[in-house]
Amino acid sequence: MTRHTETAILAGGCFWGMQDLLRRYPGVLHTRVGYTGGDVPNATYRNHGNHAEAIEIVFDPAVISYRQILEFFFQIHDPSTPNRQGNDLGPSYRSAIYYLNEQQRDIAEDTAADVDASHLWPGRVVTEIEPAGPFWEAEPEHQDYLERIPNGYTCHFIRRMEAPQARLKVEFVRRRGDRFRPFSALTTGGNQPGARGGLTNNTCQHPRH
């Protein structure tokens, strides 16, 4: 029996750190990093123009929902800094969600609005929400980089946010009346991926790759 899978495409800064955290989330089956969102064909690391560094995630929707992936995405990168993550500057490091269908677009818009309304971040959420275009797979040396080089560069970590559930519940009720859905991934402790990989809070460790 063939397993039903879905795909998500996200950009949130250097793809090394993004992949290292997202690949360990329960229900994620496969990830690969690459370049998307721009207009340079056959993009490479040395020539990707205005593409973003991005990650393609294949997941089992019976285990994890697209909404939950987005919630975790908003927890592991700063969506309020235009074209920047940590030490990394430029459009390659922008925050973006590339949806593959209208349902994903609606979920992305709802999730981004809920994060913005919660004031969990000091600034306004600037995450771009755009239709997915061509995804150019990155070179082999960029795939699973931190799995191969555990002490390599990363600016991504799981934020331990203060009482996000309570704050977001208020915003959900305010925005949607009885349509409240728990903001399940943003919890103050016991993040689900920790059970699989012992995820820790890492700061920027090395100069830009």
Swiss-Prot record:
InterPro entries (alphabetical): Met_Sox_Rdtase_MsrA_dom, Met_Sox_Rdtase_MsrA_sf
Segments forming a coiled coil: none
GO molecular function, one term: L-methionine:thioredoxin-disulfide S-oxidoreductase activity
Function, in words: Has an important function as a repair enzyme for proteins that have been inactivated by oxidation. Catalyzes the reversible oxidation-reduction of methionine sulfoxide in proteins to methionine.
Pfam families for the chain: PMSR (PF01625)
Catalytic activity, as annotated: L-methionyl-[protein] + [thioredoxin]-disulfide + H2O = L-methionyl-(S)-S-oxide-[protein] + [thioredoxin]-dithiol; [thioredoxin]-disulfide + L-methionine + H2O = L-methionine (S)-S-oxide + [thioredoxin]-dithiol
The keyword Oxidoreductase belongs to this UniProt entry's keyword annotation: yes
Protein name: Peptide methionine sulfoxide reductase MsrA
Compositionally biased intervals (Polar residues): 199-209
Enzyme class: oxidoreductase
SUPFAM superfamilies: Peptide methionine sulfoxide reductase
Keyword Oxidoreductase among UniProt keywords: yes
Region (Disordered): 183-209
Lineage: Bacteria, Pseudomonadati, Pseudomonadota, Gammaproteobacteria, Pseudomonadales
Gene Ontology BP term (one): protein modification process
Gene: msrA
UniProt EC number: 1.8.4.11
TM regions (residue ranges): none
UniProt KW keywords: Oxidoreductase
Active-site residues (renumbered): 14
Family: Belongs to the MsrA Met sulfoxide reductase family.
Organism, as annotated: Pseudomonas fluorescens
